[in-house]
Amino acid sequence: SNLSRKDSKKSYTYNIKDFPLGIIGIEKIYDSYLRGTPGIEQIEVNAQGNYVRRLSFINSKKGKNIQLTINSELQNYTHQRIGANIGAALIIDAKNGNILSSASSPSYDPNIFSKTLNKTAWEKVVNSVNAPLINRPLKGLYPPGSTFKPVVALAALKYGLIKTTDKIFCNGVYPLGNRDFHCWNKFGHGKLNLTNAIAQSCDVFFYEIALRLGIKKISETAKLLGFGSYYDEFFGVSKSIIPDKKWKLDHYNEKWQKGETLNVGIGQGFLLSTPIELAIMTANLINKGNVVIPNIIKSISGEPIINNFRKNNNFNIEHLDIIKQGMFKVINSNKGTGWKSRTEDKEFYIAGKTGTSQVRIISANERATGILKNKDLPFSKRDHGLFIGFAPYIKPKYITAVVLEHAGGGSKSAAPVGRDLLIASRRIIEGIDTNIVVS
């Protein structure tokens, strides 16, 4: 890549022809480690420019080698499993936040930047409607949909606004003022407790507890679980939008409305998050109060990088276990939204949460005549499919987050991908196969 004038002023090494330079991502962040030091030879020449003698000589020093946490085989499988879908998928180590794979689709060949790039090739990449230059796991911002419901459930437990024995009735509609807020199940779920509401992803249940909480408590809980954090390690990571009253006033100069709290309660509205945040949120839910920080550096010149937990005393471990039980039911209860993505292996039960995020407004007229199916909509109006998951349920090792743009409901689109990524992690890293249940 050609140097900018700004780069050329940073160090004399930036002006040496063919001297390697990191300009994006990890190579930019760790450029001072990787670059090394060029050798210097000072010589004397005569008036004709002929060599006379050497005055001084300093040997060059090699840069340091950096090993990433990425498992190349798992990385290749992750790309393969996304296939032709547009979106993101990643796998992290549940114990320490190490990123084992991170795939963005569509992708591009980075080697095109290692040589002179003609205008036609550049415009083809930069003007592509599917935006291959966006690193979706780190920079893609999406409504998290129902993958956000465990956050709302934990907030309700944290602030004592619900007990595990409490039940809320869902008839398919939640009236607020002069507007009806609908459940995805128009016939309703009946009476549900907290873990079953997570399992069946009941919107009405989460409308009710979101209204009890208010946006401030939801926002604060989300931030404690990692939403809105900025990780310096990942240059250019997008920061999620965790809205509250101040945020709306700052951005729209308008007061917050209760209906907006209901939308956030099901992961919609102004709320936006990145796939890496969804993975870290999952880790923070299942690690008994330990806060996980994402990491992609395994070692520098052979010296291992230890990515330690940070203790978080803001959540009751019993409350975290209740959320974990609800996520187990998502996959392993026959009424769970992820039931078709379960495994047969008791040593590798999967738990998780499916999500579907709307990108359009459904009119009252459409609800009356029948909501259009995704396949009958223009591609850009179809729902995003999401899934967060971990395995095994007991002593989790792997966490995945999957977002497939305009692929339809997460139960059918993203959950099978997430299941396969968790199974592949076990197979590739531990050499153990896992049987799935074919429904």
Residue ranges and their predicted role:
Residues 1-88, 103-136, 141, 386, ...:
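Extracytoplasmic/periplasmic proteins that interact with beta-lactams or build/remodel peptidoglycan
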Residues 45-55, 95-147, 151-402, 434:
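Beta-lactam-recognizing serine transpeptidase/beta-lactamase-like catalytic domain environment
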Residues 27, 75, 219, 320, ...:
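Hydrophobic face of alpha-helices
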Residues 405-408:
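A generic structural motif
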Residues 303-311, 416-439:
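Short, gly/Ser/Thr-rich active-site loops of penicillin-recognizing serine hydrolases
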Residues 89-94:
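Short hydrophobic alpha-helical segments used for membrane anchoring or interfacial signaling
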Residues 77, 81, 155, 221, ...:
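Generic non-transmembrane alpha-helical segments
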